[in-house]
């Protein structure tokens, strides 16, 4: 009987070894692009972006589109937007249809402004000429374009014009040390000439500190959204503030450290003497409300309209906005000019303490430190705070891409 049991166990073990889990070796983002040679009469800037659907056009994509449109306008070059992740919705076609012609990858056209959906690209080729210039934002679009250009040069003998790499964060940091980390990093090291456009000088300096070099480098600085600026300039010499804390809350984006904020607040609610008088709101991404204990809850208001965002900025006394990245992110800057006393974090060479007096930039971002500093802020609450414009470059700069004339000479 004992030998029978041993035999059954050995057999079961062998079966388990035979049934190994299938490996998933695919990196979905890098489904290849394929180019075919075509003739085109003029220089054309090709922007590779995931999507132009309204629900996706904010933050990085919005900034890239703004630069792309200004670059095309000031150089006089033709425009083509290639959509690599999401096909355009009817709403997107309606929005862009007056200025752009929508084409399939197989179609050639001399229209001066084109949009080509290319998310469904297996076995499909896009026409490319020696006058095409590629601009990408997002490491996977850079990777795929760079590899496609290498294959195109081998096949047709046409080397690409300098790439425009629109860099809005250190993207390897979006992942653990892994395949995607290395692929993102490799996109900065491609052998072809690249013009790097950095979203902030802080980000450019971080790349330099870490040994990355490009043939040409430019940086632009953040500027306050025009609608927020209008609301800011309508405010008087003082702002009425509530006992209210505004969080930049994006649980779905790890680099915004939402769980760390929650951990700090769960300590703070037991430290603040007048805790019953305070309310906490989270803006940026819709999520369920979070119970902090001691009768306090984080109320999620999701993604607000610009008017709604301006209103909550005006009335909030304190804020927390974290970013585990060398990029400053916009919310702490926006909060600070609306006289919100905001806690943020340093990261490598990033330190926002000199932006204005409303920013508290912490080197130690542990929950104990954050909760202690938040209590100090809240203990100093006053219902009216003085308001004046101290960051005029941030609020009023109408020419953030002033270097475009130099880029034209490189293309």
For each feature predicted by the language model, list its residue ranges.
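Conserved catalytic-core segment of nucleotide-activated headgroup transferases in glycan assembly
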Residues: 60-63, 181, 190, 195, ...
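A charged, aromatic-enriched C-terminal amphipathic alpha-helix characteristic of glycosyltransferases
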Residues: 365, 379-411
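A short, active-site helix/loop in glycosyltransferases that binds the activated sugar's phosphate group
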Residues: 144-145, 174-175, 180, 192-216
């Amino acid at each position: 009987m004992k030998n029978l049991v041993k035999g059954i166990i050995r057999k079961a073990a062998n079966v388990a070894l035979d049934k190994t889990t299938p490996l998933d070796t695919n990196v979905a983002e890098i489904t290849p692009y394929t180019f075919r040679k075509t003739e085109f009469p003029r220089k054309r800037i090709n922007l590779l972006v995931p999507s132009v659907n309204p629900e996706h056009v904010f933050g990085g994509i919005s900034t890239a589109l703004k630069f792309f449109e200004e670059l095309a306008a000031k150089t006089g070059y033709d425009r083509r937007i290639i959509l690599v992740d999401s096909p355009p919705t009817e709403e997107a076609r309606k929005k862009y249809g007056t200025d752009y012609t929508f084409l399939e990858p197989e179609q050639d056209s001399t229209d001066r402004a084109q949009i080509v959906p290319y998310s469904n690209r297996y076995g499909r080729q896009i026409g490319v000429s020696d006058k095409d210039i590629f601009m990408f934002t997002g490491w996977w679009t850079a990777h795929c374009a760079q590899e496609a250009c290498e294959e195109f040069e081998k096949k047709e003998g046409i080397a690409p014009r300098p790439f425009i790499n629109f860099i809005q964060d250190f993207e390897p940091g979006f992942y653990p040390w892994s395949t995607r980390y290395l692929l993102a990093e490799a996109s900065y090291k491609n052998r072809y000439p690249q013009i790097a456009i950095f979203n902030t000088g802080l980000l450019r300096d971080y790349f330099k500190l870490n040994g990355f070099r490009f043939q040409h480098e430019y940086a632009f600085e953040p500027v306050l959204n025009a609608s927020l600026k209008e609301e800011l300039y309508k405010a008087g010499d003082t702002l009425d503030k509530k006992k209210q804390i505004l969080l930049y809350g994006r649980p779905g984006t790890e680099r915004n450290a939402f769980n760390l904020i929650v951990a700090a607040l769960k300590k703070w609610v037991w430290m603040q003497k007048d805790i019953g008088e305070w309310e906490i709101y989270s803006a940026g991404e819709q999520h369920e409300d979070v119970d902090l204990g001691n009768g306090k809850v984080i109320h999620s208001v999701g993604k607000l309209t610009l008017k709604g965002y301006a209103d909550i900025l005006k009335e909030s006394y304190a804020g927390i906005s974290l970013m585990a990245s060398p990029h400053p992110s916009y919310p702490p800057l926006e909060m600070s000019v609306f006289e919100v006393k905001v806690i943020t974090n340093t990261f490598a060479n990033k330190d926002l303490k000199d932006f204005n007096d409303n920013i508290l930039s912490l080197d130690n971002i542990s929950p104990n430190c954050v909760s202690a500093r938040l209590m100090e802020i809240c203990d100093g609450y006053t219902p009216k705070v003085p308001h004046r414009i101290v960051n005029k470059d941030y609020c009023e700069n109408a020419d953030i891409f002033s270097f475009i004339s130099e880029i034209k000479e490189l293309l």
